[in-house]
UniProtKB/Swiss-Prot annotation:
<keyword id="KW-0444">Lipid biosynthesis</keyword>
<feature type="modified residue" description="Pyruvic acid (Ser); by autocatalysis">
    <location>
        <position position="188"/>
    </location>
</feature>
<feature type="site" description="Cleavage (non-hydrolytic); by autocatalysis">
    <location>
        <begin position="187"/>
        <end position="188"/>
    </location>
</feature>
<keyword id="KW-0456">Lyase</keyword>
<feature type="active site" description="Schiff-base intermediate with substrate; via pyruvic acid">
    <location>
        <position position="188"/>
    </location>
</feature>
<dbReference type="InterPro" id="IPR033175">
    <property type="entry name" value="PSD-A"/>
</dbReference>
<protein>
    <recommendedName>
        <fullName>Phosphatidylserine decarboxylase proenzyme</fullName>
        <ecNumber>4.1.1.65</ecNumber>
    </recommendedName>
</protein>
<dbReference type="InterPro" id="IPR003817">
    <property type="entry name" value="PS_Dcarbxylase"/>
</dbReference>
<dbReference type="Pfam" id="PF02666">
    <property type="entry name" value="PS_Dcarbxylase"/>
</dbReference>
<keyword id="KW-0670">Pyruvate</keyword>
<comment type="subunit">
    <text>Heterodimer of a large membrane-associated beta subunit and a small pyruvoyl-containing alpha subunit.</text>
</comment>
<dbReference type="GO" id="GO:0004609">
    <property type="term" value="F:phosphatidylserine decarboxylase activity"/>
</dbReference>
<dbReference type="GO" id="GO:0006646">
    <property type="term" value="P:phosphatidylethanolamine biosynthetic process"/>
</dbReference>
<comment type="pathway">
    <text>Phospholipid metabolism; phosphatidylethanolamine biosynthesis; phosphatidylethanolamine from CDP-diacylglycerol: step 2/2.</text>
</comment>
<keyword id="KW-0594">Phospholipid biosynthesis</keyword>
<dbReference type="GO" id="GO:0005886">
    <property type="term" value="C:plasma membrane"/>
</dbReference>
<keyword id="KW-1003">Cell membrane</keyword>
Amino acid sequence: MKQYNDLFKIIHREGYIFIASFALVSFLLASFNEKLGCIGCIATAWCIYFFRNPDRFVPISDDLVISPADGIIQEIKEALPPPELGLGDVEMIRVSIFLNLFNVHVNRIPANGKILALHYNPGKFFNASLDKASIYNERQSVLMEMAQGQKIVFVQIAGLIARRIVCDLEEGNEVKTGERYGIIRFGSRVDVYLPLKTALLVSKGQTAIGGETIIADFGRKKTTEFKFERK
């Protein structure tokens, strides 16, 4: 039984219906044409690959902000946070992480703390790599207060191909760094907003690993050693 549980654990539940559908179509195609069946099997294998849900070794500290997603650090700039969260006109540092079709699309909590507010905003489906995607695209914005009191924002943004955002959080949730909280299908972007004077530990063009790459350390002067947990 544990083997079956482990098998389902490594695939995000959002992928079950797609994988089952692709597998069924592949079986039907194979009964008519072997080549079409092979194409269907390849498509099914890709679907399994897309919805993979691997464990990560998460650095544990109340001072850390880790990447909520796999992808490329596409942009780092000062920008206003999503207006729907009511944070006013104070700019923050925005770190934008672009996910392509081959990245893991499961999203993770970037820090220890409490969820203060959530807001889903329907919108357009511009290419997620464009700067205007942060403003106009469909998005799910989350405001949280870290265990040390800092307020940060993380935003799931739909893209040209991604047409579904899944967020399992609720206002008032106490959350831990690296916990899985959602997924975006298929190809997308995640923005993280941090206080202006935050010292970043990532740079533009860097590859980020969700749940592992440290974006910022608010206690950097105190220690550079962390414990790690597999999640």
